Amino acid sequence: MSDILTKIEAYKREEIAAAKRERPIASLEADARAAPPPRGFVRALRAKHAAGDYALIAEIKKASPSKGLIRADFDPPALAQAYEQGGAACLSVLTDTPSFQGSLDYLVAARAAVSLPALRKDFMYDTYQVVEARAHGADCILIIMAALDDAEARDIEDAAFDLGMDVLLEVHDRAELDRALQLRSPMIGVNNRNLRTFEVTLATSEALAPLIPKDRLMVGESGIFTPDDLARLARVGMSTFLVGESLMRQEDVATATRALLARAA
Protein backbone atom coordinates (compact mmCIF):
# COMPACT_ATOMS: atom_id res chain seq x y z
CA MET A 1 0.00 0.00 0.00
CA SER A 2 1.23 3.50 -0.78
CA ASP A 3 2.55 6.02 1.71
CA ILE A 4 -0.45 8.23 0.85
CA LEU A 5 -3.03 5.52 1.52
CA THR A 6 -1.15 4.40 4.63
CA LYS A 7 -1.35 7.92 6.07
CA ILE A 8 -5.01 8.24 5.13
CA GLU A 9 -5.88 4.88 6.69
CA ALA A 10 -4.12 5.84 9.92
CA TYR A 11 -6.11 9.02 10.44
CA LYS A 12 -9.37 7.51 9.19
CA ARG A 13 -9.16 4.69 11.72
CA GLU A 14 -8.52 7.26 14.46
CA GLU A 15 -11.56 9.24 13.25
CA ILE A 16 -13.73 6.12 13.26
CA ALA A 17 -12.66 5.16 16.78
CA ALA A 18 -13.42 8.68 18.02
CA ALA A 19 -16.81 8.70 16.28
CA LYS A 20 -17.73 5.36 17.84
CA ARG A 21 -16.88 6.71 21.29
CA GLU A 22 -18.94 9.84 20.67
CA ARG A 23 -21.92 8.06 19.14
CA PRO A 24 -22.49 4.31 19.48
CA ILE A 25 -23.53 2.55 16.29
CA ALA A 26 -26.92 1.52 17.72
CA SER A 27 -27.94 5.18 18.00
CA LEU A 28 -26.60 5.97 14.54
CA GLU A 29 -28.33 2.95 13.03
CA ALA A 30 -31.69 4.14 14.36
CA ASP A 31 -31.20 7.37 12.41
CA ALA A 32 -30.12 5.46 9.31
CA ARG A 33 -33.20 3.23 9.42
CA ALA A 34 -35.48 6.23 10.00
CA ALA A 35 -34.01 8.28 7.15
CA PRO A 36 -36.05 8.80 3.96
CA PRO A 37 -35.40 5.94 1.51
CA PRO A 38 -32.35 6.18 -0.73
CA ARG A 39 -32.67 7.72 -4.16
CA GLY A 40 -31.58 5.09 -6.67
CA PHE A 41 -28.02 5.99 -7.71
CA VAL A 42 -27.52 3.23 -10.28
CA ARG A 43 -31.11 3.72 -11.44
CA ALA A 44 -30.46 7.41 -12.15
CA LEU A 45 -27.35 6.59 -14.19
CA ARG A 46 -29.14 3.93 -16.21
CA ALA A 47 -32.05 6.29 -16.88
CA LYS A 48 -29.61 8.66 -18.61
CA HIS A 49 -28.26 5.78 -20.70
CA ALA A 50 -31.79 4.72 -21.63
CA ALA A 51 -32.41 8.24 -22.93
CA GLY A 52 -29.29 7.98 -25.09
CA ASP A 53 -27.25 10.35 -22.93
CA TYR A 54 -23.99 10.15 -21.07
CA ALA A 55 -24.45 9.91 -17.30
CA LEU A 56 -22.46 12.37 -15.20
CA ILE A 57 -21.62 11.94 -11.53
CA ALA A 58 -20.74 15.54 -10.70
CA GLU A 59 -18.40 16.03 -7.78
CA ILE A 60 -18.50 18.66 -5.05
CA LYS A 61 -14.89 19.00 -3.93
CA LYS A 62 -13.27 21.95 -2.20
CA ALA A 63 -9.66 20.74 -2.17
CA SER A 64 -7.45 17.72 -2.79
CA PRO A 65 -4.05 16.47 -1.58
CA SER A 66 -2.51 16.83 -5.04
CA LYS A 67 -4.01 20.20 -6.04
CA GLY A 68 -4.64 21.99 -2.74
CA LEU A 69 -7.56 24.41 -2.70
CA ILE A 70 -9.68 23.91 -5.82
CA ARG A 71 -12.59 26.25 -5.17
CA ALA A 72 -12.54 29.14 -2.69
CA ASP A 73 -16.15 30.16 -3.39
CA PHE A 74 -17.52 26.90 -2.01
CA ASP A 75 -21.29 26.65 -1.54
CA PRO A 76 -22.43 22.99 -1.67
CA PRO A 77 -26.19 23.65 -2.12
CA ALA A 78 -25.57 26.16 -4.93
CA LEU A 79 -23.08 23.81 -6.59
CA ALA A 80 -25.53 20.91 -6.36
CA GLN A 81 -28.23 23.03 -7.99
CA ALA A 82 -25.83 24.11 -10.74
CA TYR A 83 -24.95 20.50 -11.46
CA GLU A 84 -28.62 19.51 -11.55
CA GLN A 85 -29.39 22.39 -13.94
CA GLY A 86 -26.44 21.35 -16.09
CA GLY A 87 -27.78 17.83 -16.57
CA ALA A 88 -25.86 15.74 -14.05
CA ALA A 89 -27.39 12.37 -13.13
CA CYS A 90 -25.93 12.12 -9.62
CA LEU A 91 -23.74 13.95 -7.12
CA SER A 92 -20.50 12.92 -5.44
CA VAL A 93 -19.70 14.83 -2.25
CA LEU A 94 -16.30 14.67 -0.54
CA THR A 95 -16.71 14.13 3.20
CA ASP A 96 -13.06 13.58 4.18
CA THR A 97 -11.79 16.61 6.10
CA PRO A 98 -7.98 16.26 6.50
CA SER A 99 -7.16 15.68 2.83
CA PHE A 100 -10.12 17.20 0.97
CA GLN A 101 -11.60 19.80 3.35
CA GLY A 102 -14.86 17.86 3.05
CA SER A 103 -17.66 17.32 5.54
CA LEU A 104 -20.75 15.20 6.13
CA ASP A 105 -22.54 18.53 6.57
CA TYR A 106 -21.74 19.31 2.92
CA LEU A 107 -23.36 16.02 1.90
CA VAL A 108 -26.52 16.82 3.85
CA ALA A 109 -26.74 20.37 2.49
CA ALA A 110 -26.01 19.45 -1.14
CA ARG A 111 -28.47 16.58 -1.24
CA ALA A 112 -31.24 18.65 0.38
CA ALA A 113 -30.94 21.27 -2.37
CA VAL A 114 -31.70 18.90 -5.28
CA SER A 115 -33.49 15.71 -6.27
CA LEU A 116 -30.32 13.92 -7.41
CA PRO A 117 -28.92 10.84 -5.65
CA ALA A 118 -25.65 11.46 -3.79
CA LEU A 119 -22.49 9.43 -3.23
CA ARG A 120 -20.57 9.83 0.01
CA LYS A 121 -17.03 10.12 -1.40
CA ASP A 122 -14.68 9.04 1.36
CA PHE A 123 -12.20 6.38 2.38
CA MET A 124 -14.33 3.62 3.88
CA TYR A 125 -12.66 1.25 6.32
CA ASP A 126 -15.47 0.27 8.68
CA THR A 127 -19.17 -0.55 8.46
CA TYR A 128 -19.73 2.25 10.99
CA GLN A 129 -19.01 4.71 8.16
CA VAL A 130 -21.68 3.07 6.01
CA VAL A 131 -24.33 3.54 8.68
CA GLU A 132 -23.05 7.09 9.20
CA ALA A 133 -23.39 7.74 5.46
CA ARG A 134 -27.02 6.58 5.35
CA ALA A 135 -27.88 8.52 8.52
CA HIS A 136 -26.66 11.63 6.69
CA GLY A 137 -28.70 10.85 3.57
CA ALA A 138 -26.15 9.16 1.31
CA ASP A 139 -27.61 7.04 -1.48
CA CYS A 140 -24.33 5.39 -2.44
CA ILE A 141 -20.92 4.73 -0.91
CA LEU A 142 -17.45 4.18 -2.34
CA ILE A 143 -15.28 1.12 -1.85
CA ILE A 144 -11.66 1.67 -2.90
CA MET A 145 -10.26 -1.79 -3.60
CA ALA A 146 -6.67 -0.56 -3.10
CA ALA A 147 -7.51 0.34 0.50
CA LEU A 148 -9.23 -2.86 1.64
CA ASP A 149 -8.81 -6.61 1.66
CA ASP A 150 -11.53 -8.82 0.22
CA ALA A 151 -13.26 -9.52 3.54
CA GLU A 152 -13.37 -5.83 4.47
CA ALA A 153 -14.75 -4.90 1.06
CA ARG A 154 -17.45 -7.57 1.29
CA ASP A 155 -18.49 -6.50 4.79
CA ILE A 156 -18.79 -2.86 3.74
CA GLU A 157 -20.71 -3.75 0.58
CA ASP A 158 -23.09 -5.98 2.56
CA ALA A 159 -23.72 -3.18 5.08
CA ALA A 160 -24.53 -0.73 2.29
CA PHE A 161 -26.91 -3.11 0.52
CA ASP A 162 -28.60 -3.87 3.84
CA LEU A 163 -29.43 -0.16 4.11
CA GLY A 164 -30.67 0.04 0.52
CA MET A 165 -27.68 1.95 -0.83
CA ASP A 166 -25.72 1.44 -4.03
CA VAL A 167 -21.96 0.85 -4.07
CA LEU A 168 -19.28 2.20 -6.41
CA LEU A 169 -16.35 -0.22 -6.52
CA GLU A 170 -13.18 1.68 -7.45
CA VAL A 171 -10.24 -0.02 -9.15
CA HIS A 172 -7.10 1.13 -10.92
CA ASP A 173 -5.41 -2.07 -12.07
CA ARG A 174 -6.21 -5.60 -13.26
CA ALA A 175 -5.74 -7.24 -9.86
CA GLU A 176 -8.16 -4.83 -8.19
CA LEU A 177 -10.66 -5.30 -11.01
CA ASP A 178 -10.56 -9.08 -10.64
CA ARG A 179 -11.27 -8.69 -6.91
CA ALA A 180 -14.09 -6.19 -7.50
CA LEU A 181 -15.78 -8.55 -9.94
CA GLN A 182 -16.17 -11.07 -7.10
CA LEU A 183 -18.40 -8.59 -5.24
CA ARG A 184 -22.10 -7.99 -5.91
CA SER A 185 -22.24 -4.36 -6.99
CA PRO A 186 -22.84 -3.82 -10.71
CA MET A 187 -20.99 -0.48 -10.65
CA ILE A 188 -17.24 -0.50 -11.35
CA GLY A 189 -15.31 2.76 -11.33
CA VAL A 190 -11.92 2.91 -13.01
CA ASN A 191 -9.82 5.57 -11.34
CA ASN A 192 -7.36 7.04 -13.82
CA ARG A 193 -5.42 8.40 -10.85
CA ASN A 194 -2.98 5.94 -9.33
CA LEU A 195 -3.49 6.34 -5.57
CA ARG A 196 0.04 5.13 -4.98
CA THR A 197 1.64 7.91 -7.05
CA PHE A 198 -1.26 10.30 -7.78
CA GLU A 199 -0.30 10.23 -11.47
CA VAL A 200 -3.25 10.41 -13.88
CA THR A 201 -3.68 8.81 -17.30
CA LEU A 202 -6.81 7.92 -19.27
CA ALA A 203 -4.90 4.91 -20.55
CA THR A 204 -5.91 3.17 -17.31
CA SER A 205 -9.57 3.21 -18.35
CA GLU A 206 -8.66 2.23 -21.90
CA ALA A 207 -6.77 -0.81 -20.61
CA LEU A 208 -9.35 -2.02 -18.09
CA ALA A 209 -12.65 -1.24 -19.84
CA PRO A 210 -12.45 -4.21 -22.25
CA LEU A 211 -12.04 -6.54 -19.24
CA ILE A 212 -15.26 -5.42 -17.54
CA PRO A 213 -18.36 -7.53 -18.33
CA LYS A 214 -21.01 -5.75 -20.38
CA ASP A 215 -23.63 -6.16 -17.67
CA ARG A 216 -21.60 -3.97 -15.31
CA LEU A 217 -21.95 -0.21 -15.21
CA MET A 218 -18.51 1.26 -15.93
CA VAL A 219 -17.57 4.65 -14.51
CA GLY A 220 -14.56 6.64 -15.70
CA GLU A 221 -13.02 8.63 -12.84
CA SER A 222 -10.29 11.31 -12.68
CA GLY A 223 -8.41 13.12 -15.40
CA ILE A 224 -11.58 14.02 -17.33
CA PHE A 225 -11.52 17.67 -18.38
CA THR A 226 -12.91 18.04 -21.89
CA PRO A 227 -15.53 16.61 -24.26
CA ASP A 228 -12.62 14.98 -26.10
CA ASP A 229 -11.75 13.10 -22.90
CA LEU A 230 -15.34 11.84 -22.67
CA ALA A 231 -15.29 10.83 -26.33
CA ARG A 232 -11.99 9.01 -25.85
CA LEU A 233 -13.43 6.94 -22.99
CA ALA A 234 -16.70 6.40 -24.86
CA ARG A 235 -14.71 4.66 -27.58
CA VAL A 236 -13.89 1.88 -25.07
CA GLY A 237 -17.51 1.57 -23.96
CA MET A 238 -17.75 4.00 -21.07
CA SER A 239 -20.86 6.17 -20.85
CA THR A 240 -20.73 7.17 -17.17
CA PHE A 241 -18.17 9.63 -15.87
CA LEU A 242 -17.25 11.11 -12.51
CA VAL A 243 -15.97 14.66 -12.96
CA GLY A 244 -15.00 17.08 -10.23
CA GLU A 245 -11.98 19.33 -10.46
CA SER A 246 -12.49 20.60 -14.01
CA LEU A 247 -16.07 21.69 -13.23
CA MET A 248 -15.25 22.98 -9.74
CA ARG A 249 -12.81 25.45 -11.31
CA GLN A 250 -15.48 27.03 -13.55
CA GLU A 251 -17.15 30.32 -12.69
CA ASP A 252 -20.48 29.19 -14.18
CA VAL A 253 -20.74 25.56 -13.15
CA ALA A 254 -24.17 24.91 -14.70
CA THR A 255 -23.09 26.20 -18.11
CA ALA A 256 -19.80 24.30 -17.95
CA THR A 257 -21.61 21.08 -17.03
CA ARG A 258 -24.09 21.53 -19.86
CA ALA A 259 -21.30 22.27 -22.33
CA LEU A 260 -19.27 19.24 -21.30
CA LEU A 261 -22.23 16.92 -21.82
CA ALA A 262 -23.68 18.61 -24.90
CA ARG A 263 -20.43 18.81 -26.82
CA ALA A 264 -19.64 15.20 -26.00
CA ALA A 265 -23.07 13.85 -26.88
Swiss-Prot record:
Organism ancestry: Bacteria, Pseudomonadati, Pseudomonadota, Alphaproteobacteria, Hyphomicrobiales
Biological process terms in GO annotation: L-tryptophan biosynthetic process
Pathway recorded for this protein: Amino-acid biosynthesis; L-tryptophan biosynthesis; L-tryptophan from chorismate: step 4/5
Similarity remark: Belongs to the TrpC family.
Database matches in InterPro entries: Aldolase_TIM, Indole-3-glycerol_P_synth, Indole-3-glycerol_P_synth_dom, Indole-3-GlycerolPSynthase_CS, RibuloseP-bd_barrel
GO molecular function, one term: indole-3-glycerol-phosphate synthase activity
UniProt cross-references to CDD domains, sorted A to Z: IGPS
UniProt protein name: Indole-3-glycerol phosphate synthase
Highest taxon in the source lineage: Bacteria
Entry EC no(s): 4.1.1.48
Keywords linked to the UniProt accession: Amino-acid biosynthesis, Aromatic amino acid biosynthesis, Decarboxylase, Lyase, Tryptophan biosynthesis
Top EC group: lyase
Keyword check for Transcription: no
Catalytic activity: 1-(2-carboxyphenylamino)-1-deoxy-D-ribulose 5-phosphate + H(+) = (1S,2R)-1-C-(indol-3-yl)glycerol 3-phosphate + CO2 + H2O
